[in-house]
Structure formats: structure tokens, C-alpha cells
């Protein structure tokens, strides 16, 4: 173990033993120890935000926000975070011994899938990939990463004396206090790599493509001419659920005198339609999953991409006879 690593671990241990003072928005200050927003907080705030780290000292208080008070901290963005099943936020400011400050925000989401989702939603295409958490990116004065159920942002004021390397070191220490980072969502492997636009895979928790029946969907962009096409994958709990949603979407896309066109293959059912915004749309069902191509240059290109994606989506385990509908 290096001297630096030992120093970080010792500092974290000391901070946890002391216990932070936590202020909960809209509540009486909770004093020393960990204060719940609603129920218990399933991680150590003091371990994630220790009092001192090599080169950094935390402000005396940690402020926490829950689902009903998040708007006080990020008024304009609170609704989006709630859509990604935000649970609570712990935030504190650190002062750098050599000058400069940085604010740390730890957003706990309901699970790793939603933590990835909000991280990907705010991903900057100009940020540099850094090794922190499951995945992280660093900008000129910021580091953002996700780890387990958490989405974490560290931001130094514009023109701050804190160099990027020191900000990354602080981010790494915070990540270490959050426990095992976990792994990228398995759904990322559903998307064929050929033509996939970098950093375009998003998790859509609800109302994908403006359809209330499309929840927990995944989408990505694919290189195309003149514009990239979109691939959307929507898993359902049952084959009947997927079949019913497909029928509703087909009805939605149909126009008087120009209904959707049925396709014999691929999958367990398919159709194609034209839409004013996306252009060509190809929808295929494979068991309890819908795979949708929007805006591809041709039906052949869309079908090839959808077919490739279907091969990558794992088939659900076979249940007792009579459950989940039939293909």
C-alpha cells in the first residue's frame, strides 16, 4: 500500500469515527450521526464525505435533500432526477489546502440502472473519460461519475485554483467511500457495435417515444445519412404485454389511407410505417421485447439492425405452461 493510499484510508476512518453534522432540508438539524430523509439511508454519508482527505478539508456540515425538497437545490432539474427515481442527495463543500474549493454532490438513485441513466443523460461529449466509479468523465473544472446506486458530481468554481488532478483525487476518495462500484448495465450489450454513435446509449425510464406503454426502455443512435438513426429496445414483463403495446403503437402510427404495413419477418411479429418526424419506422417483437428502428435510410438497413439487436437480447427463462402468453 502506498503512503498516499494509507493516508486516505486513515483519514476516512477518522472521519467516520467522528461522525459528520448533517443538516436535512426542511427539517430541524439532526446533529451528529446519520439522519434519515425518509426511512434509513443505506450507506454511510460520513464515509463517503469524510472530514479530511490529503490536501482537502470538508466544511463542518453536510446538507441532505429528499424527493420533496430536491427542488430547493436544483429547481429546474429536479423533475428529471425524480423521473430517474432519485432517493436522496448529500452535498458538502471541500476546501483545498493549497487554495480553491470544490462542491461534492452524491445523488442516490433507486438502483444502478437509474444511476447510469441520469449519468448518461448529463454526459458531456467533450468531457474526458477518467477511471473513477464504474465510469466517469472530467471537464475543465468538474468530475462526474456513477457507482452502484450513486451519481456523483464534483464541481470547482470557474477559475478555481484546484487543478483537475486534485479534483480527480477527491472524486476517487469519495468513490471509495461508496463501496463496490458494480458493473455497467447488461443492457448496453444489446446494441450492435457496428455504426453505434459513441456515448449515445440512454436509459429511458418512462414514456419512450412519447408512448406511455414504453417504460424502462433503452435507446441509442447509429451513424447514417443524412442523420443518425435511432434504435429503441423495450423489454416487457410478458409476451402478452409486448404484443399489446405493439398493437397500440401500430394503431398510433397508422394514418387514414396509409396504415402500417405488416412484415412476415423477422421476429414474432413486425410492421413498418412512415412518420413525419422520424421517417421510416420498423417495429419488431421478439417474445416479450420490442425492437424499434427509427429514421434508417432504408427498410433493409433497419431490418438488418433490428435483427442483429434481437440476437443480443437474452430470451427470458421459460416459465410454467400458460404464463407470459405465447409467441
Regions found by a protein language model. Name each.
Residues 1-5:
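Positively charged n-region of N-terminal signal peptides that target proteins for export
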Residues 82-118, 152-154, 219-245:
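A short acidic-to-branched-hydrophobic micro-motif
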Residues 50, 55, 59-84, 109-148, ...:
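Short Gly/Thr-rich strand-loop-strand
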Residues 16-35:
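Signal peptide processing junction and immediate N-terminal pro/mature segment
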Residues 7-16:
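Bacterial N-terminal signal peptides
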Residues 108-111, 120-122, 156-159, 235, ...:
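A mature extracytoplasmic/lumenal domain signature
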Residues 94-100, 136-148, 163, 220-230, ...:
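Short, low-complexity cationic-aromatic patches
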Amino acid at each position: 500500500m502506498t503512503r498516499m493510499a494509507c493516508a486516505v484510508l486513515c483519514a476516512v476512518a477518522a472521519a467516520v469515527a467522528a461522525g459528520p453534522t448533517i443538516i436535512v432540508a426542511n427539517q430541524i438539524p439532526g446533529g451528529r450521526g446519520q439522519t434519515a430523509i425518509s426511512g434509513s439511508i443505506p450507506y454511510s454519508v460520513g464515509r463517503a464525505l469524510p472530514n479530511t482527505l490529503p490536501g482537502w478539508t470538508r466544511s463542518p456540515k453536510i446538507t441532505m435533500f429528499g424527493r420533496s425538497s430536491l427542488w430547493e437545490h436544483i429547481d429546474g432539474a429536479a423533475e428529471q432526477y425524480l423521473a430517474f427515481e432519485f432517493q436522496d442527495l448529500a452535498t458538502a463543500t471541500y476546501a483545498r489546502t493549497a487554495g480553491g474549493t470544490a462542491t461534492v454532490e452524491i445523488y442516490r438513485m433507486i438502483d444502478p440502472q437509474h444511476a447510469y441513466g441520469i449519468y448518461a443523460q448529463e454526459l458531456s461529449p467533450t468531457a474526458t473519460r477518467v477511471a473513477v466509479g464504474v465510469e466517469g468523465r472530467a471537464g475543465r473544472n468538474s468530475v462526474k461519475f456513477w457507482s452502484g446506486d450513486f451519481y456523483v458530481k464534483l464541481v470547482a468554481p470557474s477559475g478555481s485554483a484546484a487543478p483537475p488532478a486534485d479534483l480527480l483525487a477527491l472524486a476517487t476518495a469519495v468513490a471509495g467511500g461508496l463501496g463496490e462500484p458494480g458493473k455497467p448495465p447488461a443492457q448496453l450489450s444489446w446494441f450492435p457495435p457496428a455504426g453505434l454513435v459513441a456515448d449515445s446509449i440512454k436509459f429511458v425510464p418512462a414514456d419512450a417515444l412519447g408512448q406511455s406503454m414504453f417504460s424502462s426502455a433503452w435507446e441509442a443512435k447509429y451513424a447514417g445519412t443524412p442523420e443518425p438513426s435511432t434504435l429503441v429496445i423495450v423489454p416487457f414483463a410478458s409476451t402478452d404485454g409486448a404484443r399489446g403495446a405493439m398493437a397500440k403503437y401500430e394503431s398510433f402510427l397508422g394514418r387514414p389511407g396509409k396504415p402500417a404495413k405488416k412484415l412476415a419477418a423477422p421476429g414474432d411479429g413486425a410492421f413498418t410505417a412512415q412518420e413525419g418526424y422520424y421517417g421510416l419506422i420498423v417495429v419488431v417483437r421478439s417474445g416479450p421485447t420490442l425492437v424499434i428502428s427509427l429514421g434508417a435510410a432504408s427498410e433493409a438497413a433497419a431490418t438488418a439492425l433490428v435483427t442483429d439487436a434481437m440476437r443480443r437480447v437474452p430470451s427470458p427463462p421459460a416459465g410454467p405452461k400458460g404464463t407470459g402468453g405465447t409467441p
